[in-house]
Amino acid sequence: MENKRNFFITIALSILILALWQVFYLGPKTEAQREQARIEEQQRQAQQAAQNRQASSSTGDTPQMPANPDSIPGQGDTKAAGAPLTRDAAIAQSPRIEIDTPSLRGSINLTGARLDDLYLKKYHETVSDKSPEIELLAPSSLKQGYFVELGFTGNDATGAVPGPNTVWVVEGNNKLTPSTPVTLTYTNDKNLTFKRVISVDDAYMFTVDDTIINNGGSTVSLASYGRVTRFNQPEHASATYVLHEGLIGVMGQDGLQEIKYAKIEDNKDISFKDVIGGWVGITDKYWAATLIPPQDEKFTGRFSHFTNDRPRYQSDLLSAPLTVAPGQSQKIQNRVFAGAKVVNTIQNYETKYHIKQFDLLIDWGWFYFITKPMFYLIDWIYKFTGNFGVAILVVTVLLKALFFPLANKSYKSMARMKLMQPKMTEIREKYADDKMKQQQAMMELYKREKINPLAGCWPVLVQIPVFFALYKVLYVTIEMRHAPFFGWIQDLAAPDPTSIFNLFGLLPYTVPHFLMIGVWPIIMGIIMFLQMRMNPTPPDPTQAAIFTWMPIIFTFMLASFPAGLVIYWAWNNTLSIIQQSVIMKRQGVKIELFDNLKGLFRRKPKEANK
């Protein structure tokens, strides 16, 4: 039965390897193939569009009356057909008002009142504070144009309502800060006046208060629209199934919607009508831009893809019709989140503004119920330690304490099984020719001695969801981005940057990515090797080979994982070795580690010459 226990442990580890292989190798490979097919299809569509392009693209991509997503106005003049523009040249094409907050800098384009120029002050492209700040939004005339826009759709009775080409007029203050909102106005030929007040907090939430004043002689009906538009896929778009990057939103009772770029290219248009409570946007790994309508009013949400002159991805929403009588006014408030997906900030916005499931803007994954609490625990401990790496080590100890009863019971059962090895050997020899009686005798022995032959599997199986949950925390939470540990580990969310194949930087050449086997993966592999040697070598040659090669396989596999995860795995295995050693010693069971290590280096006797 000892062999069966080893067999089940082998199966559990094999399943883990296959799962990791699927997620981190086959998944990206398949996604890359799909990406190549997508690019080829885009090129074909672009050629076709160039031959059949119409002078105007005013139908289909911005919500008009009646309240139908197809009524949204076109994206306006992007001036993308000419020579490529620099960012400064694109920004200089239209009048703007400056944005300056503790977290953001940029400007609002007065043409369309677009938020299309935004940098994140607190985040840089690399671990160096001297590297460029993260660029979130960019003018539509650039190749990677990315903007947020709020406007209105109307009809003949309303006249021209604010849209992508409307030039707003600034009243008073012309710099947006947390303490100084800005006011924009526009009056059309039907005596409708639109007054927009834009405010921003210290973090990443913009509040847009629109007032429609009817100074005309007839009742009018119009609707408010909003959209987040991105031209071309981002260069950093993830090719794995571990993380969602693309269009995203919560659609009332339909819940969370995650639409990858490739999916919306296939479907072109995905709509949800009569939604109450939710939001729409586009998300990256660490950043996002979203539109948040009034949570107690109906809206229509839509995800779409256009190929008029270049690929364009869009998340938009359209309010229910607003009726404004002569001499009366109507108000509507929308919010725009544009910034870093800081966990506590997102959670506070959800609570403060009652935004439905806004916390799902962060991709917590399948093990949401483990991943999110684990992050909060790590974050809480970080407040005391000041180092996320140390916090992970402390959390590992706490997890060991939490699962101690289960692990303790398992190790005790394993220790008792080792004490029973002589009796088990006796049974095998006694019933060598009768497997049925051998199994019956074994089961009676287990029952009499209160041994669970599968107990050793539990410590391994319990680690699997914890492993994936911690990986998710390290991979998706911005708090872990560029978080240092000690020494050469300056980013826990990135792989160990060293490699044994250039002697950890002593040799002056760059090592290929697949040979980046750093210090911590090697430490993890050695500790895993020692853990495997805590038990006798399985008599079955196949199992023995698997147990021998398992640490080497894991060393290569985990080398490309976040350093924080490798450190966790090494520390967790170290604690397991200590725990197992103490329990075995208390049970009077011999620890096989040292004998197994001696056996590796002991010179085998030469066979006698025949």
From Swiss-Prot:
GO biological process: protein insertion into membrane; protein transport
Molecular function, one GO term: membrane insertase activity
Official protein name in the record: Membrane protein insertase YidC
Compositional bias segments (type: Low complexity): 44-55
One Pfam family, short name: 60KD_IMP
Main location: membrane
Assembly behavior: Interacts with the Sec translocase complex via SecD. Specifically interacts with transmembrane segments of nascent integral membrane proteins during membrane integration.
Annotated compartments: Cell inner membrane
CDD domains: 5TM_YidC_Alb3 (cd20070), EcYidC-like_peri (cd19961)
Entry keywords, A to Z: Cell inner membrane, Cell membrane, Chaperone, Membrane, Protein transport, Transmembrane, Transmembrane helix, Transport
Lineage: Bacteria, Pseudomonadati, Pseudomonadota, Alphaproteobacteria, Hyphomicrobiales
Gene3D superfamilies the record matches: 2.70.98.90
Membrane-spanning ranges: 7-27, 358-378, 387-407, 458-478, 510-530, 546-566
Gene name tied to this protein: yidC
Function: Required for the insertion and/or proper folding and/or complex formation of integral membrane proteins into the membrane. Involved in integration of membrane proteins that insert both dependently and independently of the Sec translocase complex, as well as at least some lipoproteins. Aids folding of multispanning membrane proteins.
Annotated membrane topology: Multi-pass membrane protein
Family membership noted in the UniProt record: Belongs to the OXA1/ALB3/YidC family. Type 1 subfamily.
